[in-house]
Amino acid sequence: KKNTKAAVWTKYGEALVNAYEAPTGGIQPGWPRNLITERPSLTQPAEVNGQAVTKLVFADKNIYVDEAGNVVVVEVTSPITENALDKAVDAYKKAYEMDPKTEKDVVAALQKIVTNYTNDAINDYTFGNYAKASQAFEKAANPSLVAPLKELDGSALYNAGFTAALAKDYS
């Protein structure tokens, strides 16, 4: 009896999403710097998208703060596990296949994963990494096509194409 219950897969998916989100500490762009309670190991000037910022270096992330003192970008440098969101999508898909009654929880989880992929894409775009942004926007569109969500995310697809064009990737 190996992983025969949907609950095992939903818990696994939840653990993967939590592992993905943990390094950011919940910090989001737009937050004032004074809400960051952790002390950086290094503070240095940097530039993001042509804007002068301060780079706060931590063990697992870099946080870029603008001159007004607001977070511009949170860049995770040491994820807890690689491809956590991809694995989480697979786990939730498996949970739904095993028990369609998990639909409500699976839909909410997939929507959260889409948001995380979109945030990754926006970060990559902000840094001028258009090819990576395109891939992340494409990944944001993929979970929305998974049952039970099955909604075409036109914004993610448009942004994937737009950033691919910026990266001169016409394939």
What are these regions (language model features)?
Residues 1-8:
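N-terminal targeting signals for Sec/Tat export/insertion, comprising classic cleavable signal peptides
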Residues 9-14, 26:
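N-terminal Sec/ER secretory leader and immediately downstream segment
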